[in-house]
């Protein structure tokens, strides 16, 4: 079973006695796990909720970009192993780091209310991207942001930026970069909002699918855990994220492709934007659709409509060329 959508589990007469949350050990990941832990403790005061901190391959490989070492799955495989062997009952993820298709045997049991999905401009010396002088070095961890920067600010130098949030800020503070681009949600969750000099407009820099949202993953057969997590699920966030992830999934989205998808509710309708770029930012394709979304099927249909429009503009040519180039580079590194 491979499910993107939480199923309505049976009502549990008996609350859980213990629950173990698998989490990466970075400060942001632990904040997210503690946020879920605290919510579960309020729901089930007698439950002993523990956190199992784990180091993933994605945390260990810091000298190469994710697109060159295996993509988003590097942040979740160890946590999924803990779910599979029973060491943990649930795993908490930043949804933008979760692969678009989960492995068989796993499911997203809940998607929590979203934080700010925007990208943040962080700098000690400059107020905005527009204020940066020619040749200024900007650090980013994603091809999506890199493509945006190369398209809109070709006079800037864009360099990779790896590591957890604190490591990235430390690299900025020691002068490795004039500015860095980070997800606003992580900064806000850790009380670092003062580090944000500007928030990037979603039209100029559409975020990654699921950015700002937390997803709770379980082993697919754990109907009991799904039912206990049901009160944490936010339906409006989930429908928006389902539409976004459908765009990325339909186009084979991964860390190797500069792909953005962002959905927002306006006047009862869901407005969805998808964008695919070449890594040099010279070709940028954008598609937008909106509609009344009441069910997951509606959300998936909206996502499919946006991906179809992008395909009609030639998005698959971009995706296939990038994937072929990545595979060729991988063979050369072996």
From Swiss-Prot:
Name recorded for this polypeptide: Porphobilinogen deaminase
EC number(s) recorded for this UniProt protein: 2.5.1.61
Misc. comment: The porphobilinogen subunits are added to the dipyrromethane group.
Family the UniProt entry places it in: Belongs to the HMBS family.
Keyword Zinc-finger listed: no
Subunit note: Monomer.
Pathway: Porphyrin-containing compound metabolism; protoporphyrin-IX biosynthesis; coproporphyrinogen-III from 5-aminolevulinate: step 2/4
Record PROSITE patterns: PORPHOBILINOGEN_DEAM
Modification type S-(dipyrrolylmethanemethyl)cysteine: residues: 255
GO molecular function, one term: hydroxymethylbilane synthase activity
BP GO annotations: protoporphyrinogen IX biosynthetic process
Known catalytic reactions: 4 porphobilinogen + H2O = hydroxymethylbilane + 4 NH4(+)
Keyword vocabulary terms for this entry: Porphyrin biosynthesis, Transferase
Function, in words: Tetrapolymerization of the monopyrrole PBG into the hydroxymethylbilane pre-uroporphyrinogen in several discrete steps.
Cofactor(s) needed: dipyrromethane
Gene3D superfamilies xref list: Periplasmic binding protein-like II, Porphobilinogen deaminase, C-terminal domain
Name of the top EC class for this enzyme: transferase
One GO location term (cellular component): cytoplasm
